Regions:
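Positively charged n-region of N-terminal signal peptides that target proteins for export
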Residues: 1-5
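N-terminal, intrinsically disordered, polar/charged segments of Gram-positive cell-envelope systems
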Residues: 24-69
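A cross-family detector of function-defining hotspots
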Residues: 62-102, 124, 129-170
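Second-shell loop/turn segments in exported
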Residues: 48-54, 116-123
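Acidic/histidine-rich, surface-exposed loop or edge segments in extracytoplasmic proteins
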Residues: 41-48, 108-117
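Single conserved hydrophobic/aromatic residue that forms the stacking wall/gate
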Residues: 171-182
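C-terminal motif of bacterial Sec signal peptides marking the signal peptidase cleavage site
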Residues: 17-20
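Sec-dependent N-terminal signal peptides
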Residues: 7-13
Length: 182
């Protein structure tokens, strides 16, 4: 089961990296309606792990020093969306992905890997769409099988199949410094 979770984490992490390098043409262009990430207010979305509140674009080094050694290991790769390296920390049931900004490691995404953990609002993998909407409201975008909520510089993504949560992530909304993907 652990091997399966690690494989799923690797696939999801690769998907997040590739999404940063790909087109977002399936999402509506709301650029006129919303300020760019650097001008946005702080996000209301966060995730708590081992009593530590994790927020996207927060200090990844601080978070990982408090969380300790990741049980599933650590991986890094040259970033195709940001300067420097992308970093992946595989904790029980949660994957943290980091990126470098101005020479500092920042938290890019938090991905919940199984139903052992839940959001502060009580939503976990396996819950129905009705529970997501009840917890987070109806102000979401539905695209590519996902329910997408945005607040400040954070996108909360629920991947759905048959109206059931398959995966959920908090992702930092930012403008990549330059794309180096092929």
């Amino acid at each position: 089961m652990r091997k399966k979770s690690l494989m799923l984490a690797a696939v999801l992490a690769a998907g997040v990296m590739m999404a940063a390098c790909g087109s977002t043409s399936t999402l509506p262009d709301n650029s006129q309606d919303k300020p760019v990430a650097s001008q946005q207010t702080e996000s209301k979305y966060s995730f708590e792990l081992k009593g530590i509140e994790l927020k996207t674009d927060g200090d990844l080094t601080e978070y990982t020093s408090k969380l300790g050694e990741p049980s599933g290991g650590y991986y890094e790769a040259k970033s195709c969306a940001f300067e420097g390296m992308d970093k992946f920390y595989y904790y029980d049931s949660v994957t943290l992905q980091g990126y470098q900004k101005d020479g500092n490691d920042k938290l890019y995404s938090i991905t919940l890997m199984d139903d052992a953990v839940k959001t502060k609002e009580g939503v976990r993998i396996g819950d129905k769409k009705d529970k997501v909407v009840s917890a987070y409201g109806s102000d979401y975008t539905e695209a590519d099988g996902q329910l997408l909520y945005e607040s400040g510089n954070t996108r909360l993504s629920f991947v759905m199949k048959d109206d059931e949560v398959q995966s959920l992530s908090l992702i930092h909304i930012s403008e990549p410094t330059r794309l180096r993907c092929i």
